[in-house]
């Protein structure tokens, strides 16, 4: 087991390295002169040269990349062009809102999606199954920002039940913190719930058709015992896999959701950086999100043995 973990960790290094090189190269792939674009129309030649030097555009690509990668390994993601503050500091200041939104969405999505997927498979062809499938198709088809505006209009404007925008830190109270996250989590979590529920249903249908499940029924076991101890346990690996893959949906959805609900998180920081062409921030955020995605899927791979002891490393 330990040897497998070490090999997988070593295998992630070139993946993250390639991602880092691609992220760093974005600046050089930008059409035109990035320094002139950032400086604006009224900038002087000296201003453009200063920005070019700050971005390292006056140096060859590979030497600049090695210098940047070495700094990243020491926790230095560069300096923001517009605020002149370290990118690491700017990201660190916005971790809590993004982490709160992502964790709330993930937990609620799993707690809702897995049960309704199991029930839909158990009652295949019935009304509940059709409703779950209808929700899955609709939830996966509606863009996050469209659903967000619908929820804002319904629950914040018409019913006046929930606040529209902003974020309240957890230290100011659990309910104020949670109240600000309900609408964003609903908007972001719907597509995630739809995905997990659909995969759970499909996997459970396949497992419920197996001989050992029919044998468990023949022995007179309670339906709940058959579902939980025999069917769901053996369907866990594909479900856990799609939960890990769905982290990409969370990462991309966070950017849109934070922009709509004016949450001062990493997603909102990314949008502002894109608008202002603050490349060091864009590079730092993309590298951070890519690394998180790789590590989450590594953790998912390592967790398979917990759900299926037959898997050997």
Functional labels for PLM-detected ranges:
Residues 2-4, 95-130, 144, 157, ...:
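Alpha-helical transmembrane segments of integral membrane proteins
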């Amino acid at each position: 087991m330990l040897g497998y973990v070490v090999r997988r960790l070593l295998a992630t290094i070139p993946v993250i390295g390639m991602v880092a090189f691609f992220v760093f190269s974005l600046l050089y792939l930008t059409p035109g002169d990035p320094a002139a674009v950032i400086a604006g129309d009224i900038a002087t030649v000296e201003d453009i040269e200063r920005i070019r030097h700050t971005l390292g555009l006056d140096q060859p690509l590979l030497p600049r990349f090695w210098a940047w990668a070495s700094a990243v390994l020491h926790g230095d993601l560069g300096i923001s062009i517009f605020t002149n503050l370290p990118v690491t500091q700017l990201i660190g200041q916005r971790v809590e809102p993004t982490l709160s939104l992502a964790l709330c969405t993930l937990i609620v999505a799993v707690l809702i999606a897995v049960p309704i997927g199991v029930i839909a498979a158990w009652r295949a062809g019935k009304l509940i199954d059709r409703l779950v499938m209808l929700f899955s198709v609709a939830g996966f088809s509606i863009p996050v920002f469209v659903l967000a505006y619908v929820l804002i209009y319904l629950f914040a404007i018409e019913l006046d039940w929930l606040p529209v925008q902003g974020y309240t830190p957890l230290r100011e109270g659990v309910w104020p913190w949670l109240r600000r996250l309900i609408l964003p989590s609903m908007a972001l979590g719907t597509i995630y719930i739809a995905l997990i529920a659909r995969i759970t249903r499909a996997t459970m249908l396949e497992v419920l058709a197996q001989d050992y499940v029919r044998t468990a029924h023949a022995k007179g076991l309670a339906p709940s015992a058959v579902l939980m101890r025999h069917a769901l346990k053996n369907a866990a690996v594909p479900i856990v896999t799609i939960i890990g893959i769905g982290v990409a949906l969370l990462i991309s959805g966070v950017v849109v959701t934070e922009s709509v609900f004016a949450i001062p998180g990493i997603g909102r920081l990314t949008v502002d950086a894109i608008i202002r062409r603050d490349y060091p921030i864009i590079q730092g955020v993309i590298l951070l999100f890519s690394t998180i995605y790789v590590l989450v899927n590594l953790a998912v791979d390592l967790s398979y043995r917990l759900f299926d002891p037959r898997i050997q490393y």
